[in-house]
Amino acid sequence: MTGGPGSSPLFLLLLTGALSGARSRALGAYDGNASVSSACTPGFSADGYTALVSPNIMEGQKLLKVKFNGCSSGAQGIWYETNNPDFKVGADGAVYTAREVQIPAKQAKFIVAAWDHETPEKWEAAIQLFVEETPLNQSQYQTGSQSQESEQEQSQSGTLLPWRQHHKGLRRQKRDWVIPPVNVPENSRGPFPQQLVLIRSDKDRDDTIRYSITGVGADQPPMAIFNIDPIFGRMNVTRPLDREERSSYHLRAHAVDINGNKVENPIDLSIYVIDMNDNRPEFSSPIFNGSVDEASKPGTYVMTVTAHDADDINTSNGIVMYRIMDQSPQSPSHDMFVIHSKTGVINTVAAGLDREKVQQYTVVIQATDMEGNLNHGLSNTATAIITVADVNDNPPEFTRKMFIGEVPENHVDVVVANLTVVDRDQPYTSNWNAVFKIISGDPDGHFTIKTDPVTNEGIVTVSKPVDYEMSKVFPLIVMVTNQAPLASGIQMSLQSTAAVTVSVNDVNEAPYFPNRNEPIRKLEGESAGRLLITFSAVDPDHSMQQVLRYSKISDPANWLAINTTNGQVSTTAVLDRESPFVKDDLYQAKFLATDNGNPPASGTGTLLIQLIDINDNAPELLPKDAQICERPNGNGINITAIDVDRKPSADPFVFELPSVPYTIRRNWTIHRINSIYARLSLQIGYLESGMYDVPVIVTDSGNPPLYNTSIIKVKVCPCDNNGDCTTIGAVAAAGLGTGAIISILICIIILLSMVLLFVMWMKRREKERHTKQLLIDPEDDVRDNILKYDEEGGGEEDQDYDLSQLQQPETLDHVLNKVAGVRRVDERPVGAEHQYPIRPVIPHPGDIGDFITEGLRAADNDPTAPPYDSLLVFDYEGSGSTAGSVSSLNSSSSEDQDFDYLNDWGPRFKKLADMYGGADED
């Protein structure tokens, strides 16, 4: 088909009628013959509408127009809405922008819905906007939107759809065609490849055209889903599509000549996968857990279950409806719960939930797609476990109306009775935990009730001692409640109160001394045998008529005695306030009172005696010694006095000098400073240095007053300009003469000399110790001499041979070749010598220790000192001796011999060397 005069060749698109949607019109043959339509069904003229728009759309701009077919009623009573607030639909079906819109991608999608006012029917159509590469003006949009309807009408009759053509110059442009999307149902069974569209260019009459497609599903992963016949332009799908994997494909068709030159501009193809109901609803969890309070009213929210269908939620395939299939147990009704078919919210529908009867319900929930159509939809099930939560709708009740208990008097923390209760609420919760309260019968708070957390019993215990003599029976009234308040409308039961009768058992109580907050007041100085007080105790067991006996527990000064029968306390010594056992004028003693009960009981009492001071102590003078200059220079000695008595028996004091001997008042004088201080000074102009005893009389202010004569040892000494005693004066004052001082100095010198001599002697002794030789003189050392002891053992008698040849042979061959098992022990071993540990040095060893140490050191360092500590062999002379046989020696030979080598044998052979080597010198 060609365009009008002056138009360029058209790029054509043919849709195959077999792959259109449920609402798509089948395309006729390529020759343009129209197909017949079926009966009228209300709805949109198409399942989807498309339009080309610019990236930026102004507010109020018209994009396209949807057509709704209302059959006989037309479009009256129909109103439209969109799911995108950026767009709105007019009453005539025109789609506008509600605000300025900027499309971020190359396309935008939204849904237009049509509602009927009279019926709840709803119809939907998909709108898809494609962004063109070159923006169009307002008139072009209008042309495009108007041409869509005629384009759709042409598509119904099988007319080819010419695509937009571009012209050069100012020539009038042909109307643009909106290319509708291709709808392909998922899960198609083929056969494959299956043709979708036919793409043709009218230039193929003159040139050889090659067609190709690009995009996801063609040359991009997933690849090879779609292909195109490069010669004829037939685009096919090669395998079944799955909408849940990908819901749409956007391809671009290209037309080039055999040289690869572009013949037509590429066109965009949108392929939408039509959803099929091939997925069951899937619950988010196989088991849902919820709870609801017992006694809840109908309509109370319980829980929400959710299921998801992978199919298109905009179609019935993905719309899930819920229903309850089963409830277990079916008590008190088989319909205790209801579920909202669309939201999955479960509510109570009947009253009568009681946890004490049914604690848990199991509800089977079914989710069905196709809007709950059980005949055509797919279903799945899940389990909802609904727990009936406990509320405090059962008050606790005592198992008995009266409880009995008993308790011994004067005991605490004793269990009196266990109060048992029952509560049908859930155990170990605040609705079950019991709280007990004594509402009467215990005004003084002698009893408390604690709750056993395991048994929920009330344990009545004694918190304050009870007295049998005061009260023999306690009639208690106890009430029990829960930690949580009762539910609304629930009243307390008559069984929530009970009586508890507590009997008190009499026991032998200890006697007690009445509290004496105030001490008894007594004058100190009370003589022995005086009665102070009758310190009697009280026996609380009046009915027992028991006898009390008294004894003393504590009497620090041993001043008191108590009568064992009547408790009279008397003195055994004079009371003295100044005693160290008296603290703050109080003397404390403790006494014990014991009854004759079985077993006997005893109580203690403390007696406080406040001693009133009397003037029984004379003052004491201070200081006891002092020093003063031999010549008066205005200074003196400050004296004072102390009196252990208190005022008015203490200060002010009177200080005076005695009249006898007369020299006291002649040499000394006293001047009063204040009530407790006075100054003692010289009366004369000079007093010889020395020690003087100055008596001073001190009198207190008691009635009668007491006085005391005290001696002050005064040291009179010569003083310097500062009034301080000089050293000479101090020595003289000490009473030491010149001879005594010289004697002391001589003694000091002698002592120092002795110390010096002792040190010198010790150093000399230490030096001798280090240089000391062996006590045995070397001349008398015969260890290396060969002596004859007239032994009958073997061996040579001739001893005039060279011992060094035996002890130090020139070679070791005879040692190495000696017979096994025979060893010389009178010579130093050839091998490595054992190293002995060094003995620790004693700081000052004795003579014997020094001698032993030096001898050991000399023996250890002597290489030729036999014997070693081993078995001695005397009959073995070794092998390979350089001297040959000893018998070959001729000591009487007259031939001249050279004995100079004897001098090389060391000091031990010095005598032998002198005998032979020094003969010529003699």
Curated annotation (Swiss-Prot):
Disulfide bonds: none annotated. Residues 762-922 are cytoplasmic. The chain crosses the membrane at residues 741-761. Glycans are attached at residues 33, 137, 236, 289, 314, 418, 563, 638, 667, 708. Residues 176-283, 284-398, 399-513, 514-621, 620-728 form the Cadherin domain. It comes from Xenopus laevis (African clawed frog). This is Cadherin-4. Residues 25-740 are extracellular. Residues 138-159 have a biased composition (Low complexity). GO terms for cellular component: adherens junction; catenin complex. Residues 138-162 are annotated as: Disordered.
